[in-house]
Swiss-Prot record:
It catalyses: 2 D-sedoheptulose 7-phosphate = D-glycero-alpha-D-manno-heptose 7-phosphate + D-glycero-beta-D-manno-heptose 7-phosphate. Homotetramer. Pfam families: SIS_2 (PF13580). The keyword Transmembrane does not apply. It comes from Vibrio parahaemolyticus serotype O3:K6 (strain RIMD 2210633). Residues 37-191 form the SIS domain. This is Phosphoheptose isomerase. One of its GO terms (cellular component) is cytoplasm. Substrate binds at residues 52-54, 65, 93-94, 119-121, 124, 172. Its EC number is 5.3.1.28.
Length: 191
């Protein structure tokens, strides 16, 4: 009954991934992000990750696989998703939602750390403010974006952009693949 819809959805997902994969710049950016993060870990730095909605879940997934594990056992890496409900609700109430991530970066971020921000539109105000705060602290920044990069285009030290202009879930599907590859590369760099 729904087999054509299922095939159509899977084919569209494959097309978005293949378009991303066909641009060598994307591959180089993934490698650059992994090396940047591994270099931070080698200097006792950490990664702070953030996103909204499904991208927030991806930010938590990224941090969890850094502190826990990806495929194989190894020492944990310092990854923190900015996801504490009391922090998010306090800052949202007292300062506004645009400041939920930047306030955390200001409090916890240090020179040599990395901010890992996800925004499928590239226009999330709270991620933009987090990038600004990270740069002010001397941190490196990685942004996973979509579409044309939005307001984040060119702001991060490394931007990995999925150039899809349809629904955000297609961008998120590629983002999670990027996250897994970055973790795999970090593990190789840390051996």
């Amino acid at each position: 009954m729904y087999q054509d819809l299922i095939r159509s959805e899977l084919n569209e997902a494959a097309e978005v991934l293949n378009k991303f994969l066909s641009d060598d710049h994307n591959i180089a950016q993934i490698e650059a992000a992994a090396k940047m993060i591994a270099d931070s870990f080698k200097q006792d730095g950490k990664v702070l990750s953030c996103g909204n909605g499904g991208s927030h879940c991806d930010a938590m997934h990224f941090a969890e696989e850094l502190t826990g594990r990806y495929r194989d056992n190894r020492p944990g890496y310092a990854g923190i998703a900015i996801s504490d409900p009391s922090h998010l609700s306090c800052v949202s109430n007292d300062f506004g939602y645009d400041f939920v991530f930047s306030r955390y970066v200001e409090a916890v971020g240090r020179k040599g750390d990395v901010l890992f921000g996800l925004s499928t539109s590239g226009n999330s105000g709270n991620i933009l403010k987090a990038i600004e705060a990270a740069k002010a602290k001397g941190m490196k920044t990685v942004a996973l974006t979509g579409k044309d990069g939005g307001k984040m285009a060119g702001l991060a030290d490394v931007e990995i952009r999925v150039p899809h202009f349809g629904y955000a879930d297609r961008i998120q599907e590629v983002h999670i693949k990027i996250i897994h590859i970055i973790i795999q590369l970090i593990e190789k760099e840390m051996e």
